[in-house]
Amino acid sequence: VKTLTGKTITLEVESSDTIDNVKAKIQDKEGIPPDQQRLIFAGKQLEDGRTLADYNIQKESTLHLVLRLRGGMQIFVKTLTGKTITLEVESSDTIDNVKAKIQDKEGIPPDQQRLIFAGKQLEDGRTLADYNIQKESTLHLVLRLRGGMQIFVKTLTGKTITLEVESSDTIDNVKAKIQDKEGIPPDQQRLIFAGKQLEDGRTLADYNIQKESTLHLVLRLRGGMQIFVKTLTGKTITLEVESSDTIDNVKAKIQDKEGIPPDQQRLIFAGKQLEDGRTLADYNIQKESTLHLVLRLRGGMQIFVKTLTGKTITLEVESSDTIDNVKAKIQDKEGIPPDQQRLIFAGKQLEDGRTLADYNIQKESTLHLVLRLRGGF
């Protein structure tokens, strides 16, 4: 053990001796109380409870003894989660030493720690004195993730949770991290970002969630439900939903299943078109209810065609569509050949080469379809 005066003390030790034991041996030899001793090896201050083996101190190693002026000081370290750690330090401690103390208390490896004081990031080799850090100063600890990032999760109670994540983490992974921190089972968590409910199998990158983004956590009452969505082609989609889901959420689920952008979806229930900001509960949509999905064409419109049997067909059309085009769409839906179709609007039979615009047929107009018997004239 080498002192600052240059004197070297020789000690007989075991690898299993703790730093406390070593300080007691130095007290026996030199009369220096352990609480005034700081031992340094390989640039690191040695912590009392650790053993020589922990620091890989082998035979004939040299430790450096620095006297601790009575009266170290306390400083505080505040993390992004709002937790405050209290540390016992000396002005002569290096930033490395401080990070080692934080590791001992919190288990965070020094290479993942960034310490900030007065807006400056602190460099490892410098001392607290170099930065004029005095007793009861507060440092801020920011985690440096290997290739990772931090995001925030805000709960309905207003509490904000900080999570360490990677862009490649799935929403399932994020829910598991929230469970670790908050104890909320993943199946009760709904995460919302940019107004969209996040689906389990997708990644943060899929939703363009970047560092320091804020997600919103909504608790899912146990017991979601299934509803059905019927498309104009007759296909039925089954969705897992909550009563508290908004119509936007439902459209996002339909997009995930069918690839149809929400802005092209119109949902109808009990004859009413559903508005995006409202919830299923607002419309009294219960388990196993069936919604109807109508596609809203960009720049297009819907018209209705009523048959003599009273059936109404919905068509997606453009004003520039010709009557021929419309008959072809009816054939696609109903299988009726165009040459057997007669279309009537406002009491007039529509001629094939003309357009809907020519007849001032606008969105949600109703045409009447009369069948022309073969061999008629």
Swiss-Prot record:
Subcellular location: Cytoplasm; Nucleus
Keyword Magnesium: no
Major subcellular location class: cytoplasm
Gene Ontology terms, MF aspect: mRNA binding
InterPro entries from the UniProt entry: Ubiquitin-like_dom (IPR000626), Ubiquitin-like_domsf (IPR029071), Ubiquitin_CS (IPR019954), Ubiquitin_dom (IPR019956), Ubiquitin_ubiquitin-like (IPR050158)
Residues excised as propeptide: 377
Family assignment from sequence similarity: Belongs to the ubiquitin family.
Name this protein carries in UniProt: Polyubiquitin
Taxonomy of the source species: Eukaryota, Viridiplantae, Streptophyta, Embryophyta, Tracheophyta
Recorded name of the encoding gene: UBI4
